[in-house]
Amino acid sequence: MAGSGDISGNNISCTDLDISIAGSGDINSSDITCNDLQVSVAGSGDMKLNNVTANFTRASVAGSGTAILSGSTQEAEYSVAGSGDLLASDFVAKKASASVAGSGDIKCHATDFLKVRTSGSGSVGYKGNPELDYPKKGLYKL
């Protein structure tokens, strides 16, 4: 979606799914099953995806928007650039990487491994007891 507006969708089953917002729109969806999920928020938009099941997930926020994910994935790559938030503490991943550049925040849940990189005042909060690869700042337990 580009610009403003709202999109809703439920009970989505597919191989690859790419969902993106560029602008101030909102996307709400639930009950998604796919192999490869790509999620992108650019601008001030908000995305909420509930009850997602995916093998691989890549989610990014650039700007002041918010992405909220719940469900499960085998592997996840999260990135925030700017002041946005990526809230995935109810999205259980076996293996995850989280990168924040700016003042944004990532909240995630990893069971086996979590790699964290931060620059600026942003932070990463996590659930689970994963093996950690992280810098000295910007990481906290939820």
PLM regions: where:
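Extended, compositionally simple hydrophobic/Ser/Thr-rich segments
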Residues: 1-142
